[in-house]
Amino acid sequence: MASNSWQFAGADDESDDDNFNPAPADMSDEENNDNDEETTHNHRPAGKTVRQASSPVPDEEEEEEEHDEEEDARPAKRSRRDHHDDDEDEEQDEEENEEIDEEEEEDEEEEEDEEDEDDVHGGNRRKRRNKDRRAAFFDIEAEVDDEDEGEDEVGDGEEIEDFIDNAHPDDIADSGRLNDDRRHRELDRRREMEASLDAEKQAEILRERYGKRAPARGYGDMAIVPRRLLLPSVEDPSIWAVRCKEGKEREVIFSIMRRIEERMGTKNEVPITAAFERGGINSVMKGYIYVEAQRQNDILVALDGILNVYPRSNMHLVEIKDMPDLLRVIKTPNLEPGAWVRLKKPAKHAGDLAQVIDVTENGLEARVRFIPRLDYGVRDDPVFQADGKRKRPGVPGPRPPQRLFSEAEARKRHPRYLQGNPQTNSWNYNGDDFENGFQVKDIKIQQLEVKNVNPTLEEVTKFASGAEDGTENLDLKALAATLKDSAKSVAYVPGDIIEVYEGEQQGVIGKATNVQGDIVTLQVTEGDLAGRTIDVPNKGLRKRFRIGDHVKVIGGSRFRDEVGMVVKIVDDRVTLLTDQTNTEITVFSKDLREASDIGGQGSLGQYSLLDLVQLDATTVGCIVKVDRESVVVLDQNGDTKQVQPSQITNKLPKRKFAVAADRNGSEIRLDDVVREYGGQQRQGKIIHIHRSYIFLHTTTTNENAGVFVTRANSVTTVAAKGGRNTATAGPDLSAMNPALKRNPTASGKQMPAPRTFGPDRAINQTVVIRRGGYKGLLGIVKDTTDTHARVELHSRGKIITIPKADLSFKDKVTGKTIDINQRGGSRGGFGGGGRGGGEFGSRTPMASGGSDRTPAWGSSRSTARTPAWNRDAGGSRTPAWNDGSRTVNPYDGSRTPYGGATAYGGIGSRTPAWHSGSRTPAPDSFGHGSKTPAWSAGSDSWGSKTPGYGASAPTPGASGDAWGYTPGASGGGNSSSAYDAPTPGGGLSAPTPGAALNAPTPGAYSAPTPAAVSAPTPGAWQGGWGSGGDAVSAPTPGALGAPTPGAPGYADDD
């Protein structure tokens, strides 16, 4: 049974193979390959059916028939399989489904390969069947059972033949490449042909080629919209200026842009319309960003948390009228070397003309040269004004005039700050660079005025370099380039004679009949076109004058409103002789016009040229120019002002007998010729003297009619009017000294200071400058000559040279005025031997009634004892007296140095002790034989015994009388011996070095140094014998009190 069933099954298989539609002769290789693969998967025995691939590809209809046959055969095949077991059917169905899927994918790939091969062999491209892309998602291919496919294996040789292509590459070359090369050659020939045609034919070809195309369709309204309607209105979002960190404007804008992108499409979108910045190095709007929004609160929300922006402070709303200016672009001017510009900064050079030397690559800075403003004097000092007075730092002073740099003056004034090379004429002075007299500096572009420069001829002439023959070399090209822009501002009026100097009509001369904008209508007066009317642009025009024409300066020149006659014409430069000053000036022709009026006599009403007028309570000035309706005044500060006659307070009469003192104290008057001591060292004749200012007139310059002003103490006399002697003509300035008036004896005839040897005592002394520009400043002397001293100022740290006569020496500790040439104390009276003045002001220090004061000791006229002398205040004596510390004394030890013992007036000042046993050379009053030399007290006192011996003849003086002769001696004051003043003693047995009755050395009442009443230091007792004074209360040094060495004796009377 089993065998029968097996046979039945085998018969079914064979019948299936027999009933399967045999492959047609034109069966494709794809199907053949599919059958081969099916046989390999099902492990069918080979040799049953061998299909040969045919070269022709079946048509679409044949393929569809094959699919239909396969679908018809499939139900029959499935019905036969019902006899098998269920398990076998399920396994076979799964394998069939997997194989069908693989077959479909392989079929698609093989079809594409076959089509490519057919194209190569056939040479003609076959229309490729378009497959629907949606077919990939549907099972539209016919399912083929594995059993229906052939299980024949293809031989190895046949597979190799199908795999290897024996065709030659030239046989299968793509014809499209050849066509591509042909098209390129045709395009090249067409372009060469078009290039050989002229422009008109090319334009015609382009018009035929592209002219028929319809224009691109525009969006929106194509009608013209007035510009006023494009301006923002109140309905548009507002713009706020938000403060940000300078230089970070662009970073802030990028941060806002990133925040907008991050929050786009979310519920926290940035609620602003736009944000932009106008920062930059040259921008005036740097430090701000501009945000456009409906509300200000929206900006706060949008900028919250962004760095370098400060929305909650200084947010400004931009007005509607200013909104267009935020988006207006200003072209940065392009500077070229040689161009003319004007400086904005520094303030000292504001408005000065400069010439560009070079421009940096980034265009941010330019190196320019200009004429420096240096005074080389006090006005360069930041602490002083032009008048020599002190001022606060930072306050701008008057501007010095423009002058080329002078190496000689700089070396004379500040040699320490001058460096350079004389061969190249390049210098560095006070940190500034100078080349050929011009100052060279790198300045930012925004600090330069590049538009409407309008350089005047006198300014440009200063920059001209001299040639070898002495002529001026002007850079006319650079000047013309600068004047090109300013030519548009030249005002032509009907009636002007105009010349065309450039263009097709160059050389035409005519009279202006009409001016409209930049077009001038000319009526030609000379040449071939005479009588005709032409229109020319004003950029190629210039005014024309003839020698002898009467013209007036109307331009921006400093000679504005000058009237004169033309005497010379060179190109566009005109030289005229002024009517007022009879001087020649040269200006550009564009700054002139014909003058119908004739210059007056230099007067306007009651005011004439060079008159001194009062402008206000503190300002006077000299008239330097007279116009038809106004005058120009040079005030006392050196500034020029144009004022109306009604603005002048009054006219000051000319003081013929006005007197002033120059720098040397010499007397100067009107018409004297003087020269400035510093600065420009200008020389002129005095025309006005007003207080400390003098107005001078010079013929070396025409500026301000040759008038300049300076201070009287800054000039020196060159020539006095009438040839008077200026050396002795000055007033007695010593009579003006109040100190000399108060103490006239001090100003008596005094001996000059003794000549000293060795280093000058003034060196390293502290001094105060008494007069001059540095008056009142404190300094220390570094070096001296016979007449001058070099002083280092404490406040400035600089060394200046100043005459010794202008210095006052101060004590370094107390700050008191001292005399460095005096030795010891001050000398009073004639000859220096008297008591001196009796005023308390002359005592140093002043006496008072306190007895415990040091060094003052009492209310009497004797002052300044050191230390305090009162015996009751014994504790203050140094060292204390009357104790065991006295050394050396034959009785109780020498007391050192208390009371009047040292060095005057007291017994203690005698060295050695004065006891009769130790006296040298006289032991006592009885041993006359021991006196060396001896003399008689009763002998003639006029004998000038030297030395002598007497009752009381101290050396140099004693207490005989109040005249204080030096040396003096007297016992009673009535004998002739008192005036004889022998040395060492006389009178009352005054031995040397001591005397009995307070005979100190140098003296008591004669007030030498030390002295008594005239407040020397140290001093002695108040009076002599019988005067009621305390004779024994001498301070240190003093009289009778603790002498060193000495004897106590009667020193303890009280």
UniProtKB/Swiss-Prot annotation:
Residues 1-155, 387-411, 726-759, 819-897, 909-1054 are annotated as: Disordered. It is found in: Nucleus. Residues 825-840 have a biased composition (Gly residues). GO terms for cellular component: DSIF complex. Pfam families: CTD (PF12815), KOW1_SPT5 (PF23042), KOW2_Spt5 (PF23284), KOW4_SPT5 (PF23291), KOW5_SPT5 (PF23290), KOWx_SPT5 (PF23037), Spt5-NGN (PF03439), Spt5_N (PF11942). The keyword Nucleotide-binding does not apply. Residues 123-132 have a biased composition (Basic residues). Residues 1004-1020, 1034-1054 have a biased composition (Low complexity). Keywords: mRNA processing, Nucleus, Transcription. The spt4-spt5 complex mediates both activation and inhibition of transcription elongation, and plays a role in pre-mRNA processing. This complex seems to be important for the stability of the RNA polymerase II elongation machinery on the chromatin template but not for the inherent ability of this machinery to translocate down the gene. This is Transcription elongation factor spt5. It comes from Neurospora crassa (strain ATCC 24698 / 74-OR23-1A / CBS 708.71 / DSM 1257 / FGSC 987).
